[in-house]
A protein has these predicted regions:
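N-terminal active-site beta-alpha-beta segment that forms phosphate/nucleotide-binding
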Residues: 2-115
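Conserved phosphate- and dinucleotide-binding cores of soluble alpha/beta proteins
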Residues: 85-186
Length: 186
């Protein structure tokens, strides 16, 4: 391959790899393994308020993890609004069917400010580690709607990417607004 792929080319390649991965039947087992590593991390262990997400097809399955940990920590999930992401407290009785039938918090779920979050884990289409000779730098490529691009700068806590191994790439094209992540569980 010559030159760097565009973001759209990477998204198309990931979509094809996602179809193959989902057909393999490994999504649930791999999700449990990845989230097991996340929950053993000191960043998660010390956090009282944790921002997660409800998975869409091809992402690490998080719903049972969030439900289980909501008994011990304040778990938040985003609500997509026209202006971006609102952080809402996870409460099983405040979930409604959202985009593609994915559960999301209703507007009645308690709202949380970004500065209240102690730890966040986020999905992505692709991730890269240590590109351009910067070891430890973790970059994320999203779906192209910039929801997390607008949210991440307002979080003042460790932010981890969670993804299946096929989503790790050598390089991602970066924009000035891209923010590196602190951790990656893959």
């Amino acid at each position: 391959m010559t030159g760097m792929q565009s973001k759209d080319e990477i998204r198309r390649r990931m979509k094809a790899m996602q179809r193959e991965f989902l057909a393999s039947g490994r999504q649930e087992r791999e999700s449990e393994r990845i989230l097991g590593e996340l929950e053993r991390s000191p960043e998660f262990a010390s956090a009282r308020t944790v921002l997660g997400y409800m998975a869409i097809p091809g992402e690490v399955l998080t719903e049972s993890f969030i439900r289980r940990w909501s008994a011990y920590k304040r778990m938040l999930i985003p609500l997509v609004t026209p202006s971006g992401l609102e952080l809402r407290e996870y409460r099983p009785d405040c979930l409604v069917s959202g985009y593609a039938g994915i559960p999301e918090p209703s507007s009645g779920a308690p709202l949380c400010r970004p500065d209240e979050v102690d730890f966040a884990f986020v999905p992505g289409v692709a991730f890269s580690c240590g590109q351009d000779g910067e070891p430890g730098r973790i970059w994320r490529l999203g779906r192209g709607k910039a929801c997390y691009d607008r949210l991440l700068p307002s979080l003042h806590c460790p932010v981890a990417g969670v993804a299946f191994p096929f989503r790790l790439v050598d390089r991602l094209p970066l924009d000035p607004w891209d923010r590196p992540l602190d951790l990656l569980f893959i």
